[in-house]
Curated annotation (Swiss-Prot):
This protein's record includes keyword Lipid biosynthesis: no
Region described as E7 terminal domain: 2-51
Native species: Bovine papillomavirus type 5
Protein name stated in the entry: Protein E7
Primary role: Plays a role in viral genome replication by driving entry of quiescent cells into the cell cycle. Stimulation of progression from G1 to S phase allows the virus to efficiently use the cellular DNA replicating machinery to achieve viral genome replication. E7 protein has both transforming and trans-activating activities. Induces the disassembly of the E2F1 transcription factor from RB1, with subsequent transcriptional activation of E2F1-regulated S-phase genes. Interferes with host histone deacetylation mediated by HDAC1 and HDAC2, leading to transcription activation.
Length: 124
């Protein structure tokens, strides 16, 4: 707070604001229970100019399965699908928290390619 010199002027008072009545209602939000297959089928990768990455590229729905090998060694087997439909099996050593983050990464704009698609699209 800043103290100034004593003043004998009084400023005019502002009029009171108009009264506002808020009516609040309880909102119910439905859970969005889309699985990985549905999200992957809806995903269409594009560049900033909205053109497809490769002509004829249309990812198919690919299931993502994560199975834990054992509680001791924290090895998980992850099965995802290449856009061509070929299943890819990956062994991942991770903590349960990190494997959840890996699953979220797989749900994002990330495609894992089989060796055939990788060599065909990107060379050897």
């Amino acid at each position: 707070m800043v103290a100034g010199p004593a003043c004998s002027k009084f400023l005019p008072q502002d009029p009171p604001p108009p009264s506002v009545t808020l009516v609040l209602h309880d909102l119910t939000q439905e859970e969005d229970e889309q699985d990985f297959v549905t999200l992957h089928a809806q995903y269409r990768p594009t560049f900033k100019d909205k053109t497809p990455r490769r002509p004829g590229y249309n990812p198919r729905a690919a299931p993502c399965h994560i199975q834990r090998l054992s509680a001791r060694c924290s090895v998980f087997f992850v099965q995802v699908g290449c856009p061509c439909g070929q299943p890819l099996k990956i062994a991942v050593q991770s903590t349960p928290d990190c494997i959840s983050q890996f699953e979220q990464l797989l749900r994002g704009p990330l495609d894992l390619l089989c060796p055939h698609c990788a060599s065909r699209c990107y060379g050897r």
